[in-house]
Amino acid sequence: MSITIKLGQLAEFLGATLRGDKDIEITGLATLQEAGPGQVSFLANPKYRKLLVDTQATAVLLKPADADGYAGNALVVPDTYLAYARISHFFDPKPKSSAGVHPTAVIAADALIDPAASIGAFAVIESGVRIAAGVTIGAHCFIGARCEIGEGGWLAPRVTLYHDVRIGKRVVIQSGAVLGGEGFGFAQDKGIYHKVAQIGGVTLGDDVEVGVNTAIDRGALADTRIGNGVKLDNQIQIAHNVQIGDHTAMAACVGISGSTKIGKHCMLAGGVGLVGHIEICDGVFITGMTMVTHSITEPGSYSSGTAMQPAAEWRKSAARLRKIDDMARRLQKLEKAIETVTCADNRSSDG
């Protein structure tokens, strides 16, 4: 797919200040270093400012301070990365699906599918499903009994929704994601595990995105709940009964244990792990590889992951860490010895 749009049209769409030729044609996006004729680029990170000098981009998205002194065509905006995100959709080559049902799809007789939805090849849609207008169901998707998918949803090929999954409007779910799988619940008796039926479901709000191979387990009793605007990267595990507040984002390989509650506008970096039955308040940022073992009640940034260092230094640090208990005992003995000497000196002075 190719598209041509005039620079003035982009400026109007963004509400940007245009410096340059409004009639010049734009055909794509690229980085400052790789952009060529017909392409728009952007400067979001100050460390790339030096690339402005030699960029071949036809136009650049710039903040007012960076636009001063730039001789080329510019769209001046308060937030260049946000502006780039907004215009990126004009040039998205993702194929658009036509409304209708592929002849190989298997659909239950009582499923309610809006005529404006698109159902791909070999999709399976079970009894009681409701699919709203503008929804795209990719090839080989499985939509279990009584699932509901709101307007404008997009499911990539090979998405699996178990029964009783309810999805809001404009939700995007990438390939391999599984929503509504059984939670990891077992009762133990004399060393033997007995399965607990997971009778809840999964509820997603509006404008949620779920990455490739991410799993969201169904609740044991009530639903596992994902709030509006939540963004989940690839290969995330969300266990049963978890609740995630609106507009929280998580990078790849986060693992959240059962019944944990995460607030609104939180950010979890890659590889973060959370134990079960804890609560994270709104506005928390957790850095990569952090292990969260208790509730967080104050907004802010939290870390426990060990930062990289040269291997030789890391080995020395690891060796010292193994001796830390012994060092603590020696320090306690030294403190007691100093305290004894100090007390004796004080008695001598008093005498």
UniProtKB/Swiss-Prot annotation:
PROSITE patterns: HEXAPEP_TRANSFERASES (PS00101). The active site is at H240. One of its GO terms (molecular function) is N-acyltransferase activity. It is an enzyme of class 2 (transferase). SUPFAM superfamilies: Trimeric LpxA-like enzymes. GO terms for cellular component: membrane. CDD domains: LbH_LpxD. Its EC number is 2.3.1.191. This is UDP-3-O-acylglucosamine N-acyltransferase. The lineage of its organism: Bacteria, Pseudomonadati, Pseudomonadota, Gammaproteobacteria, Pseudomonadales. The gene is lpxD.
